[in-house]
Swiss-Prot record:
Residues 27-325 are cytoplasmic. Essential cell division protein that stabilizes the FtsZ protofilaments by cross-linking them and that serves as a cytoplasmic membrane anchor for the Z ring. Also required for the recruitment to the septal ring of downstream cell division proteins. Interacts with FtsZ via their C-terminal domains. GO terms for biological process: division septum assembly; FtsZ-dependent cytokinesis. This is Cell division protein ZipA. Residues 1-5 are periplasmic.
Length: 325
């Protein structure tokens, strides 16, 4: 195995060496064919027909390569002279053309260029790349650079246009808060339960006797010159029901005493009332019956008819319905 490996290594090395040699040889051959051509320096045959520029050939040197550049001067072309049958005209033209040729020859010989010799060192490795042709560098036009930050600053710093302020009366687009006027709550429906006490026939209730009966049943003379039943028997509490004179204006003339008389009195319970309405109605009915019994009178309804049990039930029902509202 080791011998086979050595053989392969040697074969590979030889192949690599052959490739390198072939590459060097090919590059030298290309270089010789490129720089070994003859450069002809030819001058215009019209200027000097007899003299011709020598043709020089340069062999490929081993190290330095001489490149002969051709510099071509402008040639003066000979104008063709129109021929004519007139002999005088031919002589003039030929003489002028000869003078021009004689003056032209020394000028062209003085302007004969010298060959320019340029040494080109052969690169050490590989092929020789062709000489780069001079390329005219593009002319750079310096354009003004625009700084966007400066523009932004300029825009920001530009003074705002002055606008004339005109006070325009504002329209009533502002919705003023609605003023909620608390409407007065509707007064609760009021009702009055009336019970009358009337004397027998044409009898009348005398003043002192009537006043004593009312006071003994818990009634107190007070506002509006009438009697009231209070929640407190001392007369300091709320009014539960009241008693008025049946004769208008309804006042009692207590100071007159015996001189005062009336055909009857009226008990009335206003609804709503303080406390329990049903209890207040029962208390008013009992008081009316007690006073009627003491004075010898009759208990009547609001229409001054006899108070019957059915009418009492109707009063109670009215009180219950009102309390439910």
């Amino acid at each position: 195995m080791q011998e086979l490996r050595l053989v392969l290594i040697l074969v590979g090395a030889l192949a690599i060496a052959a490739l390198l040699f072939h590459g060097l040889w090919t590059s030298r051959k290309e270089t010789s064919s490129k720089f070994g051509k003859k450069v002809d320096i030819d001058f215009d045959s019209d200027v000097d027909d007899e003299q011709a520029a020598p043709m020089r050939g340069f062999d490929q040197p081993k190290e330095d390569v001489v490149v002969q550049k051709e510099r071509k001067e402008p040639a003066f072309a000979r104008e063709e002279v129109p021929t004519s049958d007139d002999p005088l005209f031919e002589g003039t033209v030929s003489s002028e053309s000869n003078k021009f040729t004689e003056q032209e020859k020394p000028t062209v010989q003085q302007a004969q260029p010298q060959p320019v010799v340029q040494q080109v060192q052969e690169p050490a490795v590989g092929r020789i790349e062709p000489e780069a042709k001079p390329v005219a560098a593009p002319v750079k036009r310096e354009e003004p650079t625009i700084s966007f930050s400066a523009i932004d600053d300029e825009v920001l710093t530009q003074p705002e246009p002055i606008q004339a302020k005109v006070d325009i009366p504002e329209t009533s687009t502002y919705l003023e808060p609605e003023i909620i006027i608390a409407e007065p709550e509707p007064e609760p429906e009021q009702d009055v339960i009336v019970i009358n006490v009337h004397g027998m026939g044409s009898d009348r209730f005398s003043g002192n006797r009537l006043f004593n009966s009312l006071e003994q049943n818990g009634l107190v003379f007070g506002d509006m010159a009438i009697y009231h039943r209070h929640s407190d028997l001392s007369g300091a509490g709320k009014v539960l029901f009241s008693v008025a004179n049946m004769v208008s204006p309804g006042h009692f003339q207590v100071p007159e005493g015996e001189e005062f008389s009336t055909p009857g009195i009226s008990f009335f319970l206003p609804l709503p009332c303080y406390g329990d309405a049903e209890h207040n109605f029962k208390l008013m009915l009992q008081t009316a019956q007690m006073v009627s019994s003491e004075l010898g009178g009759n208990v009547l309804d609001e229409k001054r008819d006899m108070l019957t049990p059915n009418k009492i039930d109707e009063y109670k029902q009215r009180v219950k319905v009102f309390c439910r509202k």
